[in-house]
Amino acid sequence: MRDRISAFLEEKQGLSVNSKQSYKYDLEQFLDMVGERISETSLKIYQAQLANLKISAQKRKISACNQFLYFLYQKGEVDSFYRLELAKQAEKKTEKPEILYLDSFWQESDHPEGRLLALLILEMGLLPSEILAIKVADINLDFQVLRISKASQQRIVTIPTALLSELEPLMGQTYLFERGGKPYSRQWAFRQLESFVKEKGFPSLSAQVLREQFILRQIENKVDLYEIAKKLGLKTVLTLEKYR
């Protein structure tokens, strides 16, 4: 089973060396505990062993293991899609949301539209409704800016450099996400996003949680709350105070 770790990591081409080492360490530790035969019982034993770790460490390990378990299921190595869950008592202890380990979002996907939706929310804090309304005319790749129009208001947000290559192939369209020159519906967007996050081993992630991840990353980078509010199109910082 250990050789499957190498195969799993080989499919994660976008990961840094440090990220791969972290995955490898967590997965080897996981297999040391569950053994060669993965079952509901062995997974419960492993979860019990995690109980004394910090919440952030538990979430990291569970995330890595769930992605690995999904990989094994896809390859036919296990007969069921097993999944670890954070213990209820651990969830209650969490006072503030944690930054999730989402490097895998930058890797290739069978759901490219869902992937781009997720990245736009995660990296820019945009709402799905805002994303669906984006016209390519609102995008200036040379200056790395995007104009967001909402009701009677407009705001200009910076496009992260990493997203430029993702947007460039779509610049010949009318809308960023379209069919026959018309934008897709919110239901379509949520289905695409749902399929993508499930593929990456995060089936419970929603657009709201991804937007929260954007906020947490901004705060970790010491961005002022007023600047974050401006990026999100918020009139006040009241809803951001809880993240201090």
UniProtKB/Swiss-Prot annotation:
The record places domain Tyr recombinase at 90-244
User: Pfam families, per this entry?
Assistant: Phage_int_SAM_1 (PF02899), Phage_integrase (PF00589)
Positions of the Core-binding (CB) domain: 1-73
In its UniProt record, a GO molecular function of this protein is: DNA binding
According to the record, the signal peptide region is: none
**Disulfide connectivity?**
none
Family classification: Belongs to the 'phage' integrase family. XerD-like subfamily.
User: What's its job?
Assistant: Putative tyrosine recombinase. Not involved in the cutting and rejoining of the recombining DNA molecules on dif(SL) site.
Q: What's the protein name?
A: Tyrosine recombinase XerD-like
Q: Specify the species.
A: Streptococcus pneumoniae (strain CGSP14)
